[in-house]
Structure formats: structure tokens, C-alpha cells
Amino acid sequence: DPELTTAQSKYVESLARAGASVRWVELADPDKAVAVALECAGLLLPGGGDIEPSLFGQERIPSCGEPNPLRDTAEPKLLHAFLAADKPILGICRGIQVLNAFLGGELYQDIKPLEHVPHNDHWAKIHTVTVRRGTLLAEILKQDTVLVNSQHHQAASRVAPGLEIAALSEDGFIEALEKPDAKFCLGVQWHPEWLSEADPRQQALFDAFVNACH
């Protein structure tokens, strides 16, 4: 096991409360990563840096962060492998962007000029999202609005075919996407792992993911 950062340990703790153990997958060899990951019951796509814009059909703008070629190469393979195997997928922050970008959607490379509520550098709860009724997310959270933290400067723009919007921020940015025809495929733009210890509604996301893995 790698020596975990505080951010990584939050995922482990949230999943452990739901009754799951975590296996970290080395991405240096993407095909090997897929083979190893498919031994697991589900895939969590965690937060991280920006995605290379050319991978979703755009030219990089100056405010786009440095991409992570390792993750940009391996994560789409992992995503498609788990969808093909009909295994549960939970995407968090960068993870929701991976879902959208690599299933044929597009991203805002920088939402800063467009935002009306704070979206970056807030690990504590900072803004409200509205959950769409009838979605998997609504079934999990069991409420129409939820107060979330926010730690991103990119967001889904054009939604990928097959994905549906499950939640929006107060200023209209996509905060959750899901794939209704999958066993369990849900992405959220916030970081529930930083809130789940104190907030049962945020822990419910991990509980539902782990339940789907059984």
C-alpha cells in the first residue's frame, strides 16, 4: 500500500465506513491497470488535476492546468472496461469530468469567468446544489437540495450521450451526472469524502456505491 496523503485517506475512510476495502491501482501500464482493477467490485475515479483539452476536442486555454498524461491515458480505459463489465462506478470532482469527457461530452476549461458562487478552494460547505427528482442521486440523498464543498475550476459543459444531469449549482453548473442504463454510474463535482464523517447524506453516496458493488 502507498503512503496515503490526507486527501487519499478521506476516500479510504469513507469507503471503510460503508464496509469496503480499497485497492490502489498503479497506472504506469494502462492495460495492466485495467486487468488489476477488474478484479475489484467497483471503480472510484477520484479528484485530481485538469484533463488534456485535446481529448475532448478543444485547444488549451492559458488558465487550464497542466494535464496528467498517466491518468488521461489510463482512466478512459478503466471507465470503458467497468462499463462493459457492468460494474459500479463513482466519480468525484475530476472523476465526473472523466465520465463526461471520455464518454463524448465536453468541459469548461475554466469556470472562473462564468461563476456566480464560489467553486474553488473551499473544503468546507460553501454553496447549494439542486438535485433533480427521479434520479439515482435523489434516491440516495433523499432531498431536493444539499449544501456542498467546492474544489474545482473546471466543469462539464456539453453532456455526453447516455449521461443525464442529476444536480445543478445555484449558478447553473453541472454538479452531478449519472448513466441510467448502467448498474451504477454516478459522478459528483464536489468532494463528499471531506464531508462524509459528519454528514450522513454525504456518507450515503459511498454506502450506495458499496451496496451496488455487492
Mark where each language-model region is.
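N-terminal beta1-alpha1 cap of cysteine-dependent amidohydrolase-like domains
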Residues: 1-92, 101-102, 112-141, 145-147, ...
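Active-site helix of classical SDR
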Residues: 95
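Post-Walker A helix-loop "phosphate-sensing" segment adjacent to the P-loop in P-loop NTPases
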Residues: 104-108
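Active-site-proximal beta-strand elements of phosphoester/diester hydrolases
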Residues: 186-189
